UniProtKB/Swiss-Prot annotation:
InterPro entries for the chain: Mediator_Med16, Mediator_Med16_C, Mediator_Med16_N
Pfam families documented for this protein: Med16_C, Med16_N
Post-translational modification: Phosphorylated by KIN28.
Protein name, per record: Mediator of RNA polymerase II transcription subunit 16
Species this protein is from: Saccharomyces cerevisiae (strain ATCC 204508 / S288c) (Baker's yeast)
Gene Ontology terms: cellular component: core mediator complex; mediator complex; nucleus
Length: 974
């Protein structure tokens, strides 16, 4: 029994799409992993959709004004013709209309390959209909990634351009629609689908190893250019598919066009009608190859019993003399070779072909030839056999060519060293892989870097395609001699493994997760998918902590270079850390520190970098990702500062972004107003002025948060001065002691000065009521019980003192301890005394201590206890059952996303949420950190300076899809 290979696809963004074969009114589901309480996760309640061949004819009344023109395109023999069709309206009297049929989904494909972002989804049904969807985009605006929009539909013979937002079936009007079950095989069904990457290169982390000369782990990362067929910038996307009948469909869209196009051609000459009718392919694979703009097509025909190879070449027809003239691409098929199957193995056992898998090789490989894996079932045994081949151009020696063609211009005196590459190809056989169990599925992971075999006993083994060694045994077979040792290519290298999974007969589909840190499984008798995190059996041995932490850190970096969201790795790491914490809490904290230290090293980030470098680090994406992981792993503990330090850094980054962005946009608005000053009747002038002052208005909640935060830090200083042994209020050690947090606070104070200066220099006089936003912002900042100037001087002096200290002794270990745990190492105990004493002299002595101490600093939301409801703020099930819990096991009143988080403040804008904002269905939640926000939505009139119909874009628009922690935002149901 072979498992379905493409019935599920996990996007880089974190959205999981899978086939629904059981519902009476839906055939595809969307879900994602969602953090419930910072510790436990769940699969978000799946949204069910129905995709049927007539979907392009449906028009929802409420969104008809935003739909694009409906057109059709037909393709015959490589030519493309377009025509306009009408759009019938289905949705009114559904009871009187004939039923519409929908079919089982045969394959699902996110655009995850290479540099693609993972936001488009191709869904194929068993008849061969293909529906193209996009996430995070409505016809009129950007939206969150869990929202689907159809962009076109291909019903085998025609392509229908029709942009339409899709609704889950539970939000549709009743329809006369039913699933049509069919046992018939269709020669138009799609066997293989492949996305084509863009022309962008990617960074690939190949491995890390322990360098004994420096006593650290070093990683090797390399930039890899695109290979195979990749589309130029004037193409928005491109993809292709092979059908059972050998038909190749090639879809694409120009960047400056709304229309989607299709080119069709046949794999073989089908002039013979009888041959055309009987041609059935059982397997087909499309693989990038290193010939310029070429893909390798591998097929196996039931009729011929041959494996055949073809080269597909795409010419994008770029006009060098007229680059603005865009021509349709042209496709050409070239037959390479064909070979028969081996009937028996070396011992005479009959072989039965089970699967065909082709692994691509990038241009940086020593041998970039694609590798063909032919999987056989060895009959009358329990074994499987994988035969490995390389398809490579034939290499001819000069000596041979001299004999074959004496007239060739070859240096006969040096002919032994000359090798010539033929236009022909040959199959080179490599060593076979004998597997002691029956294989039910083969998949590739990490851009073909690994190949996983799924066995009928519920186990999975992953091999590195560079050396074909079992990844979980990589360290066991390594020599510990030499400069480099402990070579790690993935978390599996350190011994993390998938364990035993449900047996295939009970499984609808299963797949190794994107970061290779777990397996997602859907069983027939289960309502939701399940996730089995990779586990390390030998977690009790402290000596293994360093290599386990390094392996997880390297896996995280490897995933981020591939733009993978990596929540599967987070869950595996948290599971491992919690298992350690049950044995030794202190050891678990050190494990997190070791992991994060490796992350900084692999990203080449130094926590004590010079100011000019630190200014770039604090706004970088790698730091954001490091802080996300620190936040997620730190939430394993209560009463610790690991998670709080990460939240503080992320909040400070957000505040800095807000003030910096407003300062720049305010300058731009002033220039616009100045240019239009002579046009007093210009209707856009008021809009520009309003937008300018609305920018300032948007800073007021952020300014309030920052004032409250500085006050909170000073409160902690006061408490520690009076009780230096107090362990509850030591977060301030990390914030004042770590260079990164000091740099962020100083940068914010600098941006605040810029904003206040520009507001004072350019008061709004044309419409005085609008100037109230400037007045109120200055009032908020001036009411701080802590003098900002004194506070800034204090931080600058601390910086100088620490720089002098660094010259005397290394500072990396101190910085890591402060930045991760907010703890001062014992050998640096005098640092804590200095911070308290100097803060007392430089800050508190100039402030009203009573006013500071009794100031309200609630609502800062820098700890998990302020984010999640207390009813669920604990480990919700025994760790042995995993960190992912079924929604049905949660308390009844805590089964919705809204019930997980405290809905008091917008965690991006720092503004207090109104009752209407909470209940209007536009509130978003972060799937990773649990933040709630309305960022990216239209600002309600009661949140602007004066009520107006003007819709402005504020700085939080950047967080329409992604949270300040970089986690995915989704809309919570009202």
């Amino acid at each position: 029994m072979m498992l379905g290979e493409h019935l599920m696809s996990w996007s880089k963004t974190g959205i999981i799409a899978y086939s629904d074969s059981q519902s009476s009114n839906a055939n595809i589901c969307l879900t994602f992993l969602e953090s419930i309480n910072g510790i436990n996760w769940r699969f978000h309640t799946p949204q069910k959709y129905v995709l049927h061949p007539q979907l392009h004819e449906v028009q929802y009344q409420e969104s008809s004004s935003t739909l694009s023109t409906h057109s059709t395109t037909t393709s015959v023999n490589g030519s493309t013709t377009a025509g306009v069709g009408s759009t019938p309206n289905f949705g009114g009297n559904s009871n009187k209309s004939p039923p519409q049929f929908f079919y089982n989904i045969s394959s699902i494909h996110w655009n995850n390959w290479f540099s693609l972002p993972g936001d488009m989804l191709a869904v194929c049904d068993e008849l061969g209909n293909m529906t193209m969807l996009i996430t995070g985009q409505r016809p009129d605006r950007a939206t969150t990634y869990e929202k689907l929009t159809m962009v076109f539909q291909d019903n085998v013979y025609k392509i229908y351009n029709h942009v339409m937002p899709l609704k889950p079936v539970d939000k549709l009007k009743p329809m006369n629609i039913e699933r049509k079950q069919t046992r018939k095989e269709y020669n138009t069904s799609i066997l293989e689908f492949r996305w084509l990457t863009s022309s962008k290169s990617v960074i690939v982390s190949q491995f890390c190893a322990f360098d004994s000369s420096s006593n650290t782990y070093r990683s090797r990362a390399q930039q890899v250019p695109p290979y195979g067929v990749y589309h130029p910038p004037f193409i928005k996307y491109a993809c292709l598919a092979i059908r059972k009948n050998g038909q190749i469909d090639f879809w694409y869209q120009f960047s400056n066009s709304k229309d989607h196009k299709k080119i069709t051609l046949q794999l073989l000459d089908t002039s013979n009608q009888r041959f055309k009718d009987l041609q059935w392919l059982e397997f087909a694979r499309i693989t990038p190859m290193n010939d310029d703009q070429c893909m390798l097509i591998t097929t196996y025909s039931k009729l011929s019993k041959n494996i055949s190879f073809y080269k597909l070449h795409v010419n994008w027809n770029l006009n060098a003399t007229k680059p603005n003239v865009l021509n349709d691409p042209s496709l050409k098929i070239q037959f390479i070779l064909s070979t028969t199957l081996d009937p028996t193995d070396d011992e005479g056992h009959v072989l039965k072909l089970e699967n065909l898998h082709v692994v691509s090789k990038s241009s940086i490989e020593k041998d970039p030839s694609p590798e063909i894996l032919v999987l056989y079932n060895v009959c009358d045994t329990s074994k499987s056999l994988v035969k490995r081949y390389r398809l490579a151009p034939t290499q001819l020696s000069a000596e041979y060519l001299v004999i074959l063609k004496p007239d060739l211009n070859i240096d006969r005196n040096n002919s032994t060293n000359q090798i010539f590459q033929s236009r022909r190809y040959n199959l080179r056989r490599h060593s076979d892989i004998v597997l002691d169990k029956k294989v039910t599925l083969i998949t590739s992971e990490m851009f073909d870097a690994f190949v996983s075999f799924y066995f009928e006993d519920g186990t999975i083994e992953s091999y590195n395609q560079n050396d074909w060694k079992l990844e979980t045994e990589r360290l066991i077979s390594q020599s510990q001699l030499g400069k480099f040792k402990n070579i790690i290519a993935s978390p599996l290298s350190a011994g993390f493994n998938y364990g035993k999974l449900p047996l295939p007969p009970s499984v609808e589909w299963m797949k190794v997760s994107p970061s290779m840190c777990g397996v997602i499984v859907k069983q027939y008798n289960k309502k939701w998918p399940q996730f089995y995190a990779a586990v390390q059996k030998n977690y009790a041995d402290p000596e293994k902590d360093s290599i386990n932490a390094t392996a997880l850190a390297f896996g995280y970096v490897k995933s981020l270079h591939k733009q993978i969201s990596a929540e599967d790795l987070t869950i595996a790491a948290k599971t491992h850390i919690l298992r350690i914490s049950f044995l030794d809490r202190k050891r678990a904290k050190e494990f997190i520190t070791t992991l994060l230290k490796s992350l900084y090293s692999f990203f080449n980030i130094s926590p004590d970098a010079p100011k000019e470098i630190m200014d770039k680090i604090i706004t970088s994406r790698p730091l954001q990702k490091i802080m996300l992981l620190q936040l997620e792993l730190g939430s394993c503990f209560s009463q610790e500062n690991i998670e709080e330090m990460a939240r503080v850094i992320l909040y400070l980054k957000n505040v800095l972004f807000a003030f910096n962005g407003v300062a720049r946009n305010f300058h731009f608005a002033i220039e616009q107003i100045s240019n239009n000053s002579n046009q007093q009747q210009n209707p856009k002038l008021f809009q520009t002025i309003f937008s300018k002052q609305d920018l300032i208005h948007s800073l007021i909640p952020v300014a309030k948060w920052f004032v409250k935060f500085i006050t909170y830090l000073t409160q902690e200083i006061l408490i520690l001065i009076n009780d230096p042994t107090n362990k509850e209020y030591t977060l301030v050690h990390g914030i004042f002691g770590a260079k990164m947090s000091r740099t962020l606070i100083l940068s914010i104070l600098n941006e605040i000065k810029k904003v206040t200066q520009i507001v004072a220099k350019f008061p709004e006089t044309s419409y005085p009521i609008l100037n109230e936003s400037s007045t109120f912002l200055k009032l908020v900042l001036s009411e701080s019980p802590v003098d900002f100037e004194k506070f800034e001087t204090f931080l600058v002096d601390v910086n100088n003192k620490f720089i002098a200290l660094c010259e005397q002794q290394p500072s990396q270990e101190r910085e890591f301890s402060l930045l991760v745990k907010a703890e001062i190492p014992p050998e640096y105990a005098k640092v804590g005394d200095f911070l308290l004493q100097y803060a007392n002299n430089a800050v508190i002595s100039h402030a009203n201590a009573a006013a500071v101490y009794f100031a309200d600093t609630s609502g800062l939301k820098i700890s998990n206890s302020e984010f999640f409801n207390p009813e669920i703020f604990h480990l919700l099930q025994p760790l042995e059952e995993g960190l992912i819990i079924d929604t049905d096991k949660l308390p009844i009143k805590n089964r919705t996303s809204k019930s997980f988080s405290k809905l008091l403040y917008d965690d991006v804008t720092c503004d207090k949420l109104s009752v209407s904002e909470i209940s209007d269905g536009k509130l978003k939640r972060c799937s990773r950190c649990g933040s709630v926000t309305r960022a990216g939505n239209i600002i309600s009139s009661d949140k602007t300076i004066v009520p107006t119909s003007i819709q402005t874009k504020r700085w939080p628009t950047m967080y329409t899809r992604l949270c300040i922690c970089s986690g995915m935002l989704f809309e919570m149901d009202g």
